[in-house]
Structures are given as structure tokens and as C-alpha cells.
Amino acid sequence: MARNDGLRDYQQEMKLRLFEEWELHRSVMVQMPTGTGKTHLLAAVVKEFLCGGGVGMRVWIVAHRRELVEQIEETVARYGMGKEPDKSAKNGRTGKDSMPEESGRVRVFSIQWLSRNRKIMDGRPDLIVIDEAHHALAETYRELWKRYPEVRKLGMTATPCRLNRKGFTDLFDTLITSWSIAEFIGRGWLSSFDYVSIRANSREQRLVDSLKKRGADGDYQVKEMNAVLNRETGIRQLYESVRRYAAGKKGIVYAVSIAHARQIAAYYSLHGVEAVAIDSRTPALERKELVEDFIETTKQ
């Protein structure tokens, strides 16, 4: 357990605690705030797991979005466990039913691909890592527990909670928590921030409170959210908030639906804030170019 892999002190501490918990439990969830390097910790853990095991051991890493799959593949490659993914438009890797690339003994899947193609998967992994593990309550993830009950599992998340207030003890045996956000900020690992919210008795909050339907994961249903919240009055208020609190700064807006995202981008652009919408239907190459453009230019 002496490997450091360039980890920060708190990442090294979390890795040590994880391997200690694996001595007692088969399935462990790890919580770390957004921005503290969960993916780097994940890669370091996988590398140490493989180095400590026998020849032929295999690891599956499962994520819920294509972008996360590519991000994890890139990080895993930097840790010497495979090559970086080809993101070109010609690459069949981004196709709906294309086989994820073999990266040595580590393979990274989207849960959608894995659920569609599980019958063609040969053998079994020795470790399954679930990125954004708060999604693990979905039946597609639960199937992994049913099919591979004896396989060691690791869940990584910033938010180990469900909107239906139920825990994860049916999937994970124990939870390892990191420092608080305040402590990360105090030690200089996270930036400080200002938090602005709508009032508890506002019209907007009443609209949110009026949402009644829930999905299988306890979250709001997209169709109802779009019907209730995708309105010009709400979008105008979002725009006014940007002007008031974030004028001239870059930002990301998380919309409730694809249609909502496109309406927001159109409204912002019409009123002088250059904006684009990116969603699950955006082609991979175009998505990559838009993200790079956002990083490198003044696009807000």
C-alpha cells in the first residue's frame, strides 16, 4: 500500500481507507465533493488493485454518460492502463452498439451499452467500479449485483443520497466519507463560492413544489418538469439572474430537458449572452468542439 501515484494527501488517505474497508466488506461506496479528484483516485485504486492481484485480473468501470466514459478512459490511460480514446467522428467507439475498446485489463462502459450487450460479454470481472454511484439504484445497475454477487465493487459519488430518502445499504456494505466542503476550501483545495437561491415562498419555488410525478430513482419526471418549468417567464428570470450576479463571467446552466436547454440558449443569445445548448443528441465531434470553444474563448 505504499504507492502514491501523485495523489494529494486526502486522496492517498481515502485510498488507504478504501483498501482497509475491502478487508472487511465486498462492496464499498466512497464520497468526495465535486472537484476533489474522484476520477484520479478511481484510476489509482484500479492500478493498485491490479498490481496487487494475479495475472489476468480484470476491472470494469461503469458510468452513466458517454462523456464520463471518455473522461475516465483518458484518466486511466494517463495511469498507464490503456490508450486514450479516439474521439473522431469516424470512431465507431461512439456508436450505439459498438464494442468498448479493450484497455489492457481495464474496460470502461456506459451502463446503457452494458445492459444492451451483456449477453456477449465473456468472463467476469474481478472488480466493478460504479462512477456517479448515486445512480446505482436503477435496475440496470442492480443487474450487475445480481449477475456478479461475489465480485468486489466500488462506488464513487459526491452525493451518497437518494431523493426518496432511502439509503444504499442494499447495494453497498459501508460508506467512506471525505472532508467537508468547508474543510476542502479552508485547506485551499476548492475555491470559495457565493450561493444565491430563490426565496422559499417565491412563485418559482411553488412551481417546483407543484411537481408530483417521480421516476424510479425518486427524481422528478422530465416530461412534467418541462411542462411546468420550460416557460419564458422562468427563462427570463434566469437571464436576469445572470446579468445581476454573473455579468461577464462564464457559466453553465443545467436545464430540466433538451427543449429547455435549447430555449435557454436561444433566449440568452437573443439578449446578448452568447450561449449554446449541448445535450444527448449533440454529435460527439460537435460536442467536443463546443466544449473546447467554451474553455478557450469568451463564450459565456
Q: What residue spans do the PLM features occupy?
A:
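Conserved helix/coil segment N-terminal to the catalytic DExD/H
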Residues: 93-127, 138-143
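Conserved pre-motif I regulatory segment
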Residues: 1-31
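Conserved interdomain linker/interface between the two RecA-like ATPase lobes of SF2 helicase motors
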Residues: 175-252
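Post-DEXD/H (motif II) to motif III coupling segment of the RecA-like Helicase ATP-binding lobe
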Residues: 134-196
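Conserved helix-turn-beta segment of the N-terminal RecA-like "Helicase ATP-binding" lobe
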Residues: 55, 66-93
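Walker A/P-loop
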Residues: 24-45, 252-256, 278
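Conserved strand-helix element at the start of the C-terminal RecA-like helicase core
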Residues: 58-69, 224-271
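Conserved helicase ATPase core of P-loop NTP-dependent helicases/translocases
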Residues: 70, 85-100, 116, 252, ...
